[in-house]
């Protein structure tokens, strides 16, 4: 995923910084450096659930950061992330149907128990959603399976 992101950014002429997780305050310190006067604005693209959650907590927890972070995009569909999307802290999320993922995991476990040797690759569809699609019928069962 990282390679695809960097290729798109380079093609479009954007500059970027890849920040691997180091310590507990790695992302916070990078975001703080972004908010200095004259630094312009930045977009944060978090490539996994943990990074998305942490970035959303940092950006959403400060009235100042939102002025300099023009967009936060990430991965995941936990209720806390959907809430941050609804509040506007997160601009877009890539989500995958977790019910389908669980179903396929059980299906493969049963096949392994029954000693079926056929191994096949499974593909799950991912969707990019923004705030206006949170309550869309198209994604309702996937995003809110218990409601």
Language-model segments: residues:
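Hydrophobic alpha-helical segments within soluble ligand-binding/sensing domains
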Residues: 1-3, 27-28, 76-81, 96-114
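Short, solvent-exposed amphipathic alpha-helices that sit
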Residues: 1-15, 30, 54, 58, ...
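Short beta-strand elements in bilobed, periplasmic/extracellular small-molecule ligand-binding domains
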Residues: 5-28, 43, 125
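A local structural motif
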Residues: 13-19, 67-69, 89
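Hydrophobic alpha-helical
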Residues: 22-83
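Short beta-strand elements at the ligand-binding edges of bilobed clamshell
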Residues: 87-99
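Hinge/cleft segment of the Venus flytrap/periplasmic-binding protein
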Residues: 98-147
């Amino acid at each position: 995923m990282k390679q695809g992101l960097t290729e798109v950014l380079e093609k479009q002429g954007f500059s970027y910084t890849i920040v691997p997780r180091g310590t507990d305050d790695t992302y916070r310190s990078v975001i703080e450096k972004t908010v200095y006067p004259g630094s312009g604005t930045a977009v944060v693209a978090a490539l996994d659930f943990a990074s998305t959650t942490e970035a959303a907590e940092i950006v959403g927890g400060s009235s100042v950061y939102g002025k300099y972070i023009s967009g936060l995009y990430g991965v995941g569909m936990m209720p806390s992330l959907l809430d941050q999307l609804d509040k506007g802290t997160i601009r877009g999320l890539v989500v995958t149907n977790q019910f389908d993922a669980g179903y396929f995991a059980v299906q493969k476990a049963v096949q392994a128990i029954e000693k079926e040797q056929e191994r096949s690759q499974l593909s799950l569809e991912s969707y990019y959603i923004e705030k206006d699609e949170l309550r869309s019928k198209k994604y309702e069962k996937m995003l809110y399976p218990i409601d």
